[in-house]
Amino acid sequence: MFDHDVEYLITALSSETRIQYDQRLLDEIAANVVYYVPRVKSPDTLYRLVGALFRSQFIVQLPPLRLLHIVKDVFLWKLEVSEPTLPISKFYLVWNAVFESHRATWNLSQLMVLDGVLVTYPSFKQLNNAYFIDESSNKTALYYRNWKLQLFSPIWAQLWNTAIVRANLSIQHCLLIALALLFNQSNRSALLHGVDVSWNLVTEKLLDLLEEYVHGIVQPMEIFSTDSVLSTNLNHLASCLTSSITRSNEATLVNSVRKLERICRYLSDTVASLKEQQLDFKFQNVFILIILALKELSAMNMTILPNHKDTFYSMICLSLFHVHVLTQKIGTVGFPSYDYVYDNLVTYFIVMDDLSKITTVLELMKRNNTKQDPNKLVFYINFLNKITNYYGCRIRLPFITEFIEPLLHFDVFFSGKTGNTLDIEIKESIHTLTITVLSIDSSYSSQVAQWQVSRILVYLKMSMDQFIAGKLSANQILLIFGHLSTQLPSLHNYNKHLLRDSLHETYIRIVNVKNPEKKNVLIECLIVQIAFINNPHHLIGWLNICLQLINTHNKKLLQQLWEMVSSLESSLAIDWWYTTVLSSQSSKL
């Protein structure tokens, strides 16, 4: 019965009579191919069956990506189920004979048959390593290599270069997916070696394919459609795209970052309209692909012409800006490619050493829904902080007024409210930025110094109030005072009473706070500031006040007070310590 069914299938596939292939007939023949081909016992019969399949109208009538999966299923069944029929080596020998005997020009369907075989190589390798299913001493593995390099690559290039492909988007997509499915990180160079095609065009079309996929990412996907196949193979698309990028010219690279920025912008808008539970692995995989593509583009920066570099890096920056919503949700821990792209980006803007060009990028981000999108806001603030921190003394008041000052009035920062995790991150990021800008060397700009004077005491008071209200931690308030206390003396020329006022505001809060632990932390903030008093009379006065505030049993605070006093290199302060503190301690023994 089995042999009769196989012969019937061979006859059906070999028929030159025009058959009306409806969906039912296609499904029936497909099921028979998957069932019978792996089970045939005779090499001669298998040769006739595979040959009939390879030259049949049936494979032409099938959607190419479905055909690929049918052939893939045939080989996976043969490899995984290990039917007690033909040995693996003879099974592959027959397929090789069919491929080599075909002298006519290959069509798209025949290439998809070959691709369906080739995509099973990882499974073959894994199973053979584990169970030694191939007794041919590596000959079967060699078939895979030869089929890929000697058949698939040149035939794929030949089809890609034909006029019909350039005019048919559907065929383009099938060929691109067929190519991408064979890519992984280890075989990138070998697969493309000697392939005579325009890699500029391939890169362009791969990005078009990605863009189309992203536009339909939330829509239901029809089985064996382009989007459906891509959804489970974006890692292969990433390897293919990054390989193609390395073979593309400068104009294509610049156009590629423009396309990626557009894709990222659309992705950001899509994610913003979805609920948390709708963000499945498809979004994570797209995010990873985009970052890998940006990494490859960043690595090609030396090929970008000087007059295009600003645009090139601006597009990379905006791409990261748009997808920061996914960065927040997915995270970048264990993903060094993201750090590479971001660090490379920041390094460019630093090495460029031209703040006016950076303001263009900042303006684009600022106008791009930053206030309404907290994820974009986080990226914007952190990037702004990096730039401000580096350019430091070259920052001028218009820059502060335009980009930094508005952030200091955000409710999440000014009120210190603790909402969701994102609110907390925004608040902490603005605090970091505020410390950075208030720490700029004021000697380079009197306008910046005057702005710092107008802001620093307000900020310190606000920070202490937020700490007392439980909206800032002890470590955070100590960090703030540790950084900004050093700035108070340099602003003395613009406000002679700034340090005095800061000490007074700190003292008032120490006296009024009821929580003893918070009181001790604020005393630490006071100690930090006392170190910068220049007037000897005022110094001793504040040392006495500080000592009165400290509980005599609090060894930690006394130790910190001593460390501060000893660091002053002031004989007056040292004398005060020995005559006031130590004598007081001795009298209580």
Curated annotation (Swiss-Prot):
Signal peptide (UniProt feature, chain positions): none
Location of this chain's protein in the cell: Peroxisome matrix
Alphabetical UniProt keywords: Peroxisome, Peroxisome biogenesis
GO biological process: protein import into peroxisome matrix
Short motif Microbody targeting signal, span: 587-589
This protein's record includes keyword ATP-binding: no
Domain of life from the UniProt record: Eukaryota
GO molecular function terms listed in the Swiss-Prot or TrEMBL record: protein-macromolecule adaptor activity
Listed GO CC annotations: peroxisomal importomer complex; peroxisomal matrix
Misc. remarks from the entry: Present with 538 molecules/cell in log phase SD medium.
Functional note: Required for peroxisome assembly.
Designated name of the protein: Peroxisomal biogenesis factor 8
Source organism per UniProt: Saccharomyces cerevisiae (strain ATCC 204508 / S288c) (Baker's yeast)
